[in-house]
């Protein structure tokens, strides 16, 4: 007899799934909104994954999450490139886009300040991203605060502060303002090729000096040290440019997906909690043999298999999930206590105490007192139920993480 699954309503929660030093794109980014994503499919897909979780069908849930991430990946993201005039912002944008300065679509560059209004650019290397080339600071008497207001910093998702030759007070002010807005930002030191060609210091020492100078200036104003990249816009394959690209791709995924998937995880957590509550009630009030479809409700190993099946974390399902996510099954099983009863008992001291030799002997002696035996049996089952539910949450969190950043095999 196969155990039945209960349907429960779920409300979104916001667990601590992905801590960062910076606030997410939105602290209240509801998963099922379509105005952000431009897709009316998301509410439907969200409901289908919730239904799959209630029914213990994790593979169906994985398919839904993948569709969700694919849709979220199309959300437009705005990146502001800013800094002092003459720091090479336009040249950097061209290098980031892997485009020559003389091409028609390139950002104008030159000795004279060419960028007088903010200009947007796109790149096939960063789909659905708008790179904004902002006018440089310092060319007018305009304050940094007025500049921030005029350039509409509040509309930006991620900032790249360009510096060269020196890390000025304007750079520090920009960093402090952006940090106060809770936005992600990088500092990119350009023209490194020129620094290396004119410096008497070794390359290693010069790079250390630049980074230490940036850190010291930020610390004076209590600004948290952001990602810093030392590059040459003349060669986007050297120095920190590859690292910058990789970091940017990851942060774009975080900006688009982190908050919606945190909300979705909260919904999943609620569904798992509701299922636990339903089964606790059944354990307390119903025959365990009938509820679980087992012959011996004291056979903890067999009962554990049933609980894993109820939540969809049985061996076959976990194997299918791992294959679908493009990784080995041990990536998921390594974090599971409930792989088998021996492992579960070893990992959980409460269950180990409930099933130790002394308790088992006591259990056998009190066979003639059904109420006492029944109470102990139910305690064991509730503990197993709780542990399987915890494993389910861990697997769900890993699925969501891996859907944003696929594991490297």
Curated annotation (Swiss-Prot):
Gene Ontology CC, one term: autophagosome membrane
Effect seen on changing residue 362 to E: Decreased lipid-binding
Residue positions, PTM Phosphoserine: 202
Subunit structure: Interacts with ULK1; promoting the coassembly of ULK1 and BECN1. Interacts with BECN1; enhancing BECN1-interacting partners and influencing the composition of the BECN1 complex. Interacts with ATG16L1. Interacts with NOD2; promoting Irgm1 'Lys-63'-linked polyubiquitination, which is required for interactions with the core autophagy factors. Interacts with STX17; promoting STX17 recruitment to autophagosomes. Interacts with ATG8 proteins (GABARAP, GABARAPL1, GABARAPL2, MAP1LC3A, MAP1LC3B and MAP1LC3C); promoting STX17 recruitment to autophagosomes.
EC number: 3.6.5.-
Protein name: Immunity-related GTPase family M protein 1
Keywords per UniProt: Autophagy, Cell membrane, Cell projection, Cytoplasmic vesicle, Endosome, Golgi apparatus, GTP-binding, Hydrolase, Immunity, Innate immunity, Isopeptide bond, Lipid droplet, Lipid-binding, Lipoprotein, Lysosome, Membrane, Mitochondrion, Nucleotide-binding, Palmitate, Phosphoprotein, Ubl conjugation
Organism: Mus musculus
Cross-link (Glycyl lysine isopeptide (Lys-Gly) (interchain with G-Cter in ubiquitin)): 270
Region (Alpha-K amphipathic helix): 350-374
GO BP annotation list: autophagosome assembly; autophagosome maturation; cellular response to type II interferon; defense response; defense response to bacterium; innate immune response; negative regulation of defense response to virus; negative regulation of hematopoietic stem cell proliferation
Consequence of changing residue 363 to A: No effect on subcellular location
Residue ranges constituting the IRG-type G domain according to the UniProt record: 75-251
CDD domains (alphabetical): p47_IIGP_like
Binding site for GTP: 84-91, 109-113, 191-193, 232-234
PTM text: Palmitoylated on C-terminal Cys residues. Palmitoylation, together with the alpha-K amphipathic helix, which binds phosphatidylinositol, mediate binding to membranes. Ubiquitinated via 'Lys-63'-linked polyubiquitination in a NOD2-dependent process. 'Lys-63'-linked polyubiquitination is required for interactions with the core autophagy factors. Ubiquitination at Lys-270 by the DCX(WDR77) complex, also named CLR4(WDR77) complex, in intestinal cells, leading to its degradation by the proteasome.
Record's catalysed reaction(s): GTP + H2O = GDP + phosphate + H(+)
Outcome when changing residue 367 to A: No effect on subcellular location. Abolishes Golgi and lysosomal localization
A GO term, aspect molecular function: GTPase activity
Pfam families tied to this protein: IIGP
Coiled coil regions, renumbered to chain: none
Effect of residue 362 to A: No effect on subcellular location
UniProt tissue specificity: Expressed in lung and primary macrophages.
Effect on the protein upon substituting residue 358 to A: No effect on subcellular location
Keyword GTP-binding: yes
UniProt subcellular location: Golgi apparatus membrane; Cell membrane; Cytoplasmic vesicle, Phagosome membrane; Cytoplasmic vesicle, Autophagosome membrane
């Amino acid at each position: 007899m196969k155990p039945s699954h209960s349907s429960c309503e779920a409300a979104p929660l916001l667990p601590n799934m992905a801590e960062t030093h910076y606030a997410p794109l939105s602290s209240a980014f509801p998963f099922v909104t379509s105005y952000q994503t431009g897709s009316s499919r998301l509410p439907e897909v969200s409901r289908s994954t919730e239904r799959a979780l209630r029914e213990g069908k994790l593979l169906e849930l994985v398919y839904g999450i993948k569709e969700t991430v694919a849709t979220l990946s199309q959300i437009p993201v705005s990146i502001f490139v800013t800094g002092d005039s003459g720091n090479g912002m336009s040249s950097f944008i061209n290098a980031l886009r892997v485009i020559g300065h003389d091409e028609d679509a390139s950002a104008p560059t030159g000795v004279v300040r060419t960028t007088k209004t903010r200009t947007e650019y796109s790149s096939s290397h960063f789909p659905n991203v708008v790179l904004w080339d902002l006018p440089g600071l310092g060319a007018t008497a305009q304050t940094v605060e007025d500049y921030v207001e005029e350039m509409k910093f509040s509309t930006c998702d991620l900032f790249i502060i360009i510096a060269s030759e020196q890390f000025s007070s304007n750079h520090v002010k920009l960093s402090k303002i952006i940090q106060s807005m809770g936005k992600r930002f990088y500092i990119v030191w350009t023209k490194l090729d020129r620094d290396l060609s004119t410096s008497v210091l070794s390359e290693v020492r010069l790079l250390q000096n630049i980074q230490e100078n940036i850190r010291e200036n930020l610390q004076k104003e209590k600004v948290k040290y952001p990602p810093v990249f030392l590059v040459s816009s003349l060669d986007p394959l050297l120095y920190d440019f590859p690292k910058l690209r990789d970091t940017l791709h990851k942060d774009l995924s975080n900006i688009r997906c982190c908050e919606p998937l945190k909300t979705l995880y909260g919904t999943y957590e609620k569904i798992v909690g509701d299922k636990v509550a339903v089964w606790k009630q059944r354990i307390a009030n119903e025959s365990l043999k009938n509820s679980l479809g087992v012959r011996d409700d004291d056979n903890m190993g067999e009962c554990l298999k049933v609980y894993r099946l109820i939540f969809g974390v049985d061996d076959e399902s976990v194997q299918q999930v791992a294959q679908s996510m493009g990784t080995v099954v041990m990536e998921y099983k390594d974090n599971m206590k409930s792989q088998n009863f021996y492992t579960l008992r070893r990992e959980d001291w409460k269950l180990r105490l409930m099933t130790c030799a002394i308790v088992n002997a006591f259990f056998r002696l009190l066979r003639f007192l059904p109420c006492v035996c029944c109470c102990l049996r139910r305690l064991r089952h509730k503990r197993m139920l709780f542990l399987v539910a915890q494993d389910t949450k861990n697997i769900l969190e890993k699925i969501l993480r891996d859907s944003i950043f696929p594991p490297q095999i």
